[in-house]
Regions:
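A short loop-to-beta-strand structural motif that recurs across blades of beta-propeller domains
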Residues: 79, 120, 167, 233, ...
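Beta-sheet-dominated scaffold domains
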Residues: 364, 370, 405-510
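Beta-strand initiation motifs
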Residues: 87-90, 284, 324-326, 344-348, ...
Length: 510
């Protein structure tokens, strides 16, 4: 009788003599002690089990277990959920998009999310204070049923249809006042969580002055309150940071677009830098701050400067901040004028278009405490400030092995693999400023990637669906700096004439 390969390979090949048919719903485990005639056990696959119904009722666009294993972050539709070890989901934020796969990573302090058009960050914290059902009319929240926890003032409010940056500002029992206007006529499940901090503060220009705070402030947190523009965030701690600049003497011989560097003081990566925005007869009359510095000892006023041009004699009077997480001065991204009032610092932030050199990204990873991400449909990629979700404007570079665009990024063995359309290259952290990374000589490869989300870690390396100038859809594993083919002809045959740019891969351990 015929001999069927019930245990063994499973694929369809062009030739029936090479065709192993299909094995459905089993995976094999070989007893390593039985050698050539080893015993093989077949285990049924478990299939899919529904664990968590998410209220957004939309596609799950991405998931990641946060470092430490306490929480999983999942994006469903336009909402960001944090799921605890008991599989209880809590909405903690809202994206500006609702479809398409997202990239998620974290550094143990912040979760970083990219959706192709925007970038977001969530300060890792206990996400839930209360879960309840309620309706909203204008700024009035009416609670119809408390499911778990306790509702209180100074809690951020989340749920389908609730505007971002909404805070419960007053009320008790079943009637509460919220900071944003909404209309939810039918009772829906909502959840609240304590804000990161309640502030007594004022804003003048891009300086936030905090006179009282209930919690710790960090770069990347959203600031909300009466009159505060949506999307206002802390971009830098005030301590050692230049908040404002006055020209003391304008010097001579300067030209528009000259680069100016403040001399003196003790600083970290870089001193404060400027670009000349206006001159009058060679005398500087206007400056644009390009980097606010990070001083441990600030320069003495009037501060001397150097330039890339031919000008001399420009001196500046610098005002630096005092904020280190508590009261003091902080740098924000929006210029406002608001007298002292109650404001709130929130843990979830949609990063503004002014963050970094470009907006958006569709893949992100973490290396040496830098978030690294791409600029979609270009060769560019960027790195955030260390241990921060904020990106300095000049902290970016371009893949340049070939003219093809950068498609995907993965960090492996402390290095950054830039996978393009048909070529790839590897960069490493060398600690330079403003961009910490440099390309490793000899790391270029004539293999790119066919699908940006086909990258998956496997063993001590990673695999992906490759592409080069001769074709695509080989599955390869990175071996050092160069990919090695691991797919069989039969596997590749299944990908022939298929659209694979939207392929997604994942690995698991039995």
């Amino acid at each position: 009788m015929s001999d069927f390969g019930f245990v063994g390979p499973s694929y369809e090949a062009p030739s029936i003599y090479q065709d192993a048919q299909e094995c459905i719903n089993f995976y094999p485990e070989i007893d390593p002690f039985k050698q050539d005639r080893g015993t093989i056990a077949l285990y049924p696959t478990p299939g899919l089990t529904s664990l968590i119904p998410l209220s957004a009722q939309a596609e799950v666009r991405g998931m990641r277990t946060v470092s430490g294993g306490q929480y999983m972050v999942a994006v469903c539709g336009g909402y960001v959920y944090v799921i605890n070890a008991s599989f209880v989901p809590t909405i903690v934020g809202q994206l500006n998009t609702s479809t398409g796969r997202v990239g998620i990573t974290d550094n143990g302090l912040n979760v970083y999310i990219v959706d192709g058009v925007y970038r977001y960050t969530w300060r890792i914290s206990n996400p839930s204070a209360a879960t309840f059902q309620g309706t909203i009319s204008g700024t009035t929240l009416t609670v119809t049923k408390v499911i778990t926890g306790t509702i209180a003032t100074n809690q951020a409010l989340f749920g389908v249809g609730i505007p971002a940056e909404t805070v419960i500002v007053s009320g008790s029992g079943t009637t509460w006042t919220i900071s944003k206007t909404a209309s939810i006529a039918t009772a829906e499940v909502m959840n609240s969580s304590a804000v990161a901090s309640v502030l007594t503060s004022s804003i003048s220009g891009t300086t936030l002055t905090v006179t009282a705070t209930s919690g710790t402030l960090y770069p990347g947190q959203t600031i909300t309150g009466t009159g505060v523009t949506n999307g206002t965030i802390i971009t830098a701690l005030g301590s050692g940071t230049v908040l404002s600049t006055a020209i003391n003497t304008g010097g001579t011989g300067y030209a528009v677009n000259d680069s100016i560097t403040v001399t003196g003081g003790v600083y970290g990566n870089s001193p404060a830098t400027y670009t000349v925005s206006s001159v009058s007869g060679g005398v500087v009359t206007g400056l644009t701050l390009t980097y606010s510095g990070a001083y441990t000892s600030v320069p003495t006023n009037p501060a001397s400067t150097s330039t890339t041009g031919s000008g001399t004699g420009l001196t500046l009077n610098l005002t630096t901040g005092t904020g280190t997480g508590g009261t003091g001065n902080y740098v924000i991204n929006n210029s406002l004028s608001i007298s002292s009032e109650t404001m709130y610092a929130l843990n979830f932030t949609a990063l503004p278009s002014s963050d970094g050199a470009f907006t958006g990204a569709d893949v992100v990873d973490i290396v040496d405490n830098y978030f690294v991400y791409n600029n979609p449909n270009t060769q560019q990629w960027a790195a955030s400030n260390i241990l921060s979700p904020i990106t300095y404007g000049l902290s970016y570079a371009s893949k340049f092995t070939g003219p093809d665009n950068l498609v995907s990024i993965i960090c492996d063995h402390g290095q950054v693999y830039l996978l393009g359309e048909t070529t790839s290259e590897v960069w490493s952290d060398v600690g330079t400023f403003p961009f910490a990374f440099q390309r490793i000589p000899g790391s270029s490869s004539q293999h790119g990637i066919a699908a940006k989300f086909s990258v998956a870690r496997a063993g001590n390396s990673f695999i992906y669906l490759s592409k080069n100038t001769r074709g695509q859809a080989e599955i390869v594993m990175m071996n050092g700096y160069f990919p090695t083919r691991i797919s069989t002809h039969a596997v590749e045959n299944t990908l022939v004439d298929q659209y694979v740019a939207d392929a997604v891969s994942y690995t698991y351990q039995l």
